Structure formats: C-alpha cells, structure tokens
Amino acid sequence: MWCLLFVVNGGQVVAQSSPLYADQSYLYTPVRLSHGDLERTVRALIDTGCSFCVIDSTFAIDSCGWDRAALAPLHTRAASGARVPVHSGVLERVNFCGTTFIAVKCLVVDLKGKFLHYAPNFIIGENLLSAQPLCIDAPNGRLTVGDVPGENATVLRWQTRESRDGTFTKGIFLKGRVGGKKVRIFLDSGSRYNKVNAALLPDAPRELMELPQADISRRLEVLRVPVCRAVETQVGDYTTRLNFVLTDRPDAVLNFDFLRNTVFVLDYDRREIRIKQ
C-alpha cells in the first residue's frame, strides 16, 4: 500500500489535516473514495475497533461501482464476539487526512441494514489509522498527520492481540482500573458505549436504561440494560469518571469519551497515546 504523507507549501513541509466532527461518542472526518471513474466524498467514522476499513455494501455497489461478483467471502468478528460471514474488496484510492492510500482492503458489510440511521457509509479502520501518527484535537475539531508541539502530559502505552483465525489483527489493549479493580481495556472508538463486566462493580449504584444497540451480527434494537454512572476510571496515569454499560464480557471497552476534552496523538508504530498538555 503506497501513500503520500506530506505536501510542500512555499518551501515548507506542511503536515496534512482534516476537519473532525464529534457526534455523541463518535468522531468523524471526511474521506474521498475513488474507484474506477467514480469519486465520492463521505463523512467516515474513525474506528480503532476495526482491523480493516469497512464500506456499506449498498453504497459500495450503487455509488462506488463495485462488482458484487468480484467480492471475496470471508469471516470476521462482531463486537459481541460472534463470527460473521462478510465479503472483502479493494478500493482503488482513499484520501484520508491529506494522505492518498492505494489499493485499500475493505470489509463489505450491510451497515445500513444493521445500524439503520446510525450507519456510516465508510469506516476508517486500523489499516489506515496505523499508517502514520495522528493528532486528534477534538476540542478544536482538527485531525492532523504527525505529532504536535508541546509536552506530553501523559503517555498511555498499549499492547496488541491477534486472533488465531485471522479475523482480528492489532487492536489497542490498555491496562487500567475501573472502580478500583484492575482490568484490561480494549479501546474501541466505534463503540457507542463504554462497557465493563458487571462483576467488577457489584456494589456500585446502577439503573436500567433503554439504549439502542447493534453490531454487524444483529440489527439495531432498543434494549433495557444496567448502567453505572460516574465510575472512577484509571488508564495508565490518566484518571477520569465515566458511565458504563454493564456486560458479562471479560474485557472492558472504552471509546474516545475519556479523551474527549484532550488533544492526543495516536501512534501505532510506538503503541502510544500521547496526551498533550
């Protein structure tokens, strides 16, 4: 996969940037998708929980001119852990944050059929997010390639994990505490909610809430689920308070909520999240 990282402007090398849009717990940025003679610009979801980019199946065929017969069948994992049959294809070009990527592998999924009106047309997965350090400045709505000036207030280092069946690669796993209990945390910016095993918070006040939930294995539905509010959460040396949906899964899941009011650099090469002062 070839990419162009920087442009030269007036003799100076200028890092590329893109607008960043927050919508509840999600972060979006514009990308330009090119396939054959067709070109589309869409608002794409930034998703650290996806190993590969994902394109909605209807959008891929109707708007980007993909040939359904040319798609390759494979399996991937839903957020629930279920093994799900999908397809894959190669998008000729993706321009993401001023960087043009060639021959980008994408999973082709019926996003609109599963997530309904919440579904994006395109999801930016780790195969693009990991190509270069990205500075995410949510307060000012900018996404920039590379680091930014300023001291690091906190550095969060992560580990990765790959599934034996190849359906999941890389991934960001952090060490932390939720409610004072040690836990391994999966950073999934495509998760609508923060989640933690209910057994870690046996005495915490909880309430039942009706929340919309879906993944690529099941259609969107409103479920009545237990929620704990304002739970003290520590990731590395960074401490905050977050709301959690209670589950029976062993790993906690955090989206970008805990970094919402910060400027941070996501660096896959160094396996670091550098929170700036």
Give the location of each predicted region.
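Bacterial N-terminal signal peptides
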Residues: 1-9
